[in-house]
Amino acid sequence: MVAAYANDNWSQPNLQPAREDINLLLEDVTVDTFVQNLQENITTDSLDFDIQVLNGDSSKLGKKDFTHNVNIIFYDGDNSEHKMREFFINMIDFTEDVFTLVVDDANIEENVAITKRFIDAMGLKILYERELLNDQEDVDMWWNGLYVVVLSKSTL
């Protein structure tokens, strides 16, 4: 079974690309827009999926919000060290012993550095890591880069 949880506070409903040569018309993006996109693009009829949309500040999430422990987290949130650490500390309570953390905007070196400082501070073991970097807002790649790290809470 795949248990998927999506969370956002929808604080940037009209977020636009920084590059002027990219023309995307994004207006009034809300939780309803996200749910509609899910319904149009994901077929769960033949697959064992549990998809939940959690609306609100991700730093307030806890084990109570999840039916299953999480083994993949895609963090695409506030890039301040305070908010990233706040979320990362909370996520430890609802992740499996081995889990994958994907951090968006890895082209911003500080985002990767913040994540690595958290990993060290929590004593997590890195089983695998990779930085997927590319040009800023690359529509054919990872937009602003990804940092992928497989972590273990135990020392193995």
Summary of predicted features, one role per range:
Residues M1-L156:
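S-adenosylmethionine/decaboxylated-SAM
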